[in-house]
Amino acid sequence: MLEKFVDSLWKFCRKSKFQYMTPVADAVDSFCFEPLHTPSSPPFVRDAVDVKRWMMLVVIALMPTVFVAIWNSGLQALVYQSSDPQIMEAFLHISGFTSYFSFVSKEIGIASVLFAGCKIFLPLLFISYAVGGTCEVLFAIIRKHKIAEGLLVTGMLYPLILPPTIPYWMAALGIAFGVVIGKELFGGTGMNILNPALTGRAFLFFTFPAKMSGDVWVGSNPSKIKESLAMMNSLAERSNFDGFSQSTCLQILNSTPPSVKRVHIDAIASNILKLEHVPSQEVLQSQFSTWAESFPGLTVDQLSLDQLQNFVTSPTAEGGLGLLPAHFDAAYSLTDAIYGIGKFSTGNLFFGNIVGSLGETSTVACLLGAGLLLLTGIASWRTMLSFGLSSLFFAWLFKIISILAAGQSGAWAPAKFFIPVYRHLFIGGLAFGLVFMATDPVTSPATKLAKWFYGAFIGFLTILIRLINPAYPEGVMLAILLGNVFAPSFDRIALKQYRQRRV
């Protein structure tokens, strides 16, 4: 039956009046069956894995992130829009898989979570394929060439890097820009120098920044989520710094001013977690001893919230830590991110029980996809490894430099440099970009040595933007796009090295 439909489509397109539709018939035939065409120029390689199957393997590798996107976006939306502080409290204090699924089944419902997630993700996926496919077809008809299979992957990647609240017309505009400007302008699939999905996201980020950052990470209606959070905070009598919010770890890291130092974070952590020792313990205890002269019997781990705020914001000459009162909220939030408190626990970050772009929240889902891509040889392990190691190294290097520059074990160094190095792999889109974006064989270098340079360059830029640039909370997107631009240069350097070795 399918074969008859394809045959009838070919007959229809072979009529003189509709010959311009031949690329459409060829695309449908290639999608349903084995491609009809063979290479017209060398190299000629006989292999069962053609471009279509290669693309489908990438789509299969993306399935774990797609499932997490549906599940997590649905769960976060239902919890955040519940207006019930008890549900939110229970959700934030989940520990372990047993309590997690017990909470979902009792408080929310598995079917409800999946239905809510599908309502958020599937329309964006449909828009991505429909609009992107239309652009591909139009260019194929105009240029009279075959429709390539590249959109199979681009159409899946694009919605996974969007916030769930993105308006549909913006999503359509972004994928159109990515396909037309990022790919077709350079000649189509295999000719583009920029990743089309990231190009579309970059266009939206710089054109509509308010819709791509801020409070855009939960549900599909930001206004409803804000009202629900305000009601929950009111009912739970929570203040600004300990209230429920949809801030991501990267947002907190980026928005924290340099005036928030390591000693401020350690003081707050000592009080919340009842820690007996923190990295800046010597400075902290010295200041506290002076401040506590007016409050005999107090210890830093037994302060009330008001006393803690008073200690942290009092002038250093009086034994306080000298933080501006207006920055106490930021310091309190950053403490959660650095010490893994509440929703920013290592387990939540690794498995994806956090808010963020649809497909970028779960590191474990990205690693499952990486396993398939590496097993099939589609992705370069050199790019992945150099990207990951470079990110870890430069995050560690910034930390060491800040300690050496500030002295006193880094007690007075900016606190944002002290987020645990490994956490950079779990937050934002680093894991997703490392696995699925940086390894794009079209926009990444072709030589082995160049792949090492390329991955290291992207890792360095990612951490540099995250920790130094105050304008952008996430550096992965810009780092990979810049890496795409410099990829030919890395290949040129690598080839030059090869020639020198042979001589």
Curated annotation (Swiss-Prot):
Coiled coil: none annotated. Its main location: membrane. It is an enzyme of class 7 (translocase). It is a multi-pass membrane protein. PANTHER family: ELECTRON TRANSPORT COMPLEX PROTEIN RNFD, NA(+)-TRANSLOCATING NADH-QUINONE REDUCTASE SUBUNIT B. Belongs to the NqrB/RnfD family. Composed of six subunits; NqrA, NqrB, NqrC, NqrD, NqrE and NqrF. NQR complex catalyzes the reduction of ubiquinone-1 to ubiquinol by two successive reactions, coupled with the transport of Na(+) ions from the cytoplasm to the periplasm. NqrA to NqrE are probably involved in the second step, the conversion of ubisemiquinone to ubiquinol. This is Na(+)-translocating NADH-quinone reductase subunit B. The gene is nqrB.
